[in-house]
UniProtKB/Swiss-Prot annotation:
EC identifiers of the protein: 3.1.-.-
Family matches, as SUPFAM superfamilies: Acid phosphatase/Vanadium-dependent haloperoxidase
Keyword Hydrolase found: yes
Gene Ontology molecular-function annotations: hydrolase activity
Pathway: Bacterial outer membrane biogenesis; LPS lipid A biosynthesis
Lineage of source species: Bacteria, Pseudomonadati, Pseudomonadota, Alphaproteobacteria, Hyphomicrobiales
Transmembrane segments: 21-41, 85-105, 119-139, 174-194, 201-221, 225-245
Domain of life: Bacteria
GO annotations of cellular component type: plasma membrane
Protein's UniProt name: Lipid A 4'-phosphatase
SMART domains: acidPPc
């Protein structure tokens, strides 16, 4: 055996976080790293939106130098129906979870399932803090980034601004970040709580919906790649944060017993 074979290069080792808090930190800094990449290279957003944009000849009333056209998938009835179903699905799931949580607290003593109640509270809390509060109330209402269909490079009237910029002129319900992608990311997180007996049946369709939802928003010209990526990932960050918080509280209670 040669010295070379004894010391064979094995390549970089990717280590998974050992704790939930470690997973939260990894996801948190990944979110900021991706935002930095999208801000430094705004052409990424423009390129991927151009893949779904179909330019047309402008009519005589258009100003010189105008870009005319649209996003064909936006006008598809089938895709719009699919988008509506995917949009409502997370909130239907949330209603069922709230009902199950009420059922949990109707039990007392030995019949009360504390772990199940904790998981339901984490799931519902992540939806309220992430997609509802952080994304729809704070980011989309105050960051002012125009959607692709609103920008002049895709036939709109407003100027393009990069991800995270506050310089945009969108007034309300803006592009940064995608609320539907955030809800899809939240739905994906719930797979952590799926019993093993149901995983083979539920994981493929839920994962597919979680990916197709942001992909459709991109193809409709409703969001840029950065909007759907960061929106989707934001739910994972919030979910991991709440899991880490509740686990630390549970460990503290156990240590006091």
């Amino acid at each position: 055996m040669t010295a070379f074979s004894k010391h064979r290069w094995r390549g970089p080792v990717i280590r998974r976080p050992k704790t939930t808090f470690g997973a939260f930190l990894l996801l948190f800094w990944t979110w900021w790293a991706l935002l930095a990449v999208f801000r430094a290279f705004p052409g990424i957003d423009i390129y991927f939106s151009q893949l779904f944009f179909l330019g047309t000849d402008c009519d005589a009333t258009a100003a010189a130098g105008s870009i005319c056209g649209g996003f064909p998938y936006r006008d598809s009835g089938n895709f719009d129906l699919l988008r509506t179903i995917f949009f409502r699905l997370p909130y239907v799931v949330a209603i069922v979870m709230a009902w199950k949580l009420i059922e949990c607290y109707q039990q007392h003593g030995a019949t009360f399932n504390a772990e199940r109640a904790r998981k339901l509270k984490v799931g519902l809390g992540a939806l309220l803090i992430g997609p509802v509060l952080l994304v729809n109330v704070i980011l989309k209402e105050h960051w002012g980034r125009p959607r692709p269909v609103q920008t002049d490079i895709f036939g709109g009237a407003l100027h393009f601004v990069e991800a995270g910029s506050l310089a945009g002129k969108c007034v309300s319900n803006c592009s940064f970040v995608s609320g539907e992608a955030a809800s899809a990311g939240w739905l994906f997180c719930l797979l952590l709580f799926v019993p093993k007996s149901l995983r083979y049946a539920l994981v493929p369709p839920v994962a597919a919906i979680s990916i197709l939802t942001p992909a459709m928003r991109l193809s409709f010209g409703a969001h840029y790649l950065s909007d759907v990526t960061l929106g989707w990932l934001s739910s994972l960050v919030v979910f991991a944060a709440l899991l880490a918080l509740t686990e630390s509280q549970q460990h503290q209670k156990n240590s006091e017993i």
